Amino acid sequence: MIEKHGGIVLLIPHYANFEWITGMSSIMQEGDIPVQIYKPLHNKYMDAMFKRIRTRFGGYNVAKHSTAREIIKLCRDNKRVAVGMITDQSPNPNEAHYWTTFLNQDTVFMDGAERIAKLMDFPVFYCELQKQGRGYCRVRFDLITETPKATADGEITECFARRLEQTIRREPPYWFWSHKRWKLKREDTIQHG
């Protein structure tokens, strides 16, 4: 599918070993680039260390604030990309665009992955990790849509939320429960049209 569309978007939850994307180049065709979107750390030494760790197997780090620009540049250079985004974190209050019920809680989701998918018209996959034993996981790529521009606003993000909820209900211990998922309340956020 990367060959056909020039790229794909991978929606990745904080589930099991979510850092698997850093080694994804080993399962991609030569020349395809696994792109990892990340939020730079305030401590420049820790940031440099994490970037070094996450790129040692051929991954390409892109800072969250320059995602669209970097992906467009890679595509203009005729690079095929698999853009991996961990999308179940709580966004900043001014980035709180999509609210839904998730695990029986009013929950805001980041919608940056959906925006990138629509901008580039890249197919979108939900990445489900299944623990196979100590130190082993299997990743299943479930197609959400091959035509993101044809979807309604919020449809891709909602689909991600529903699939993640199913994954968590099936095996709750592997979700990263400690990342303050419900710290934002609707009344504390800027509402967008």
Regions inferred by a protein language model and the residue ranges of each:
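Non-catalytic C-terminal accessory region of glycerolipid acyltransferases
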Residues: 2, 27, 52, 65-193
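Catalytic core of membrane glycerolipid acyltransferases/transacylases, capturing the structured
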Residues: 6-65, 92-101
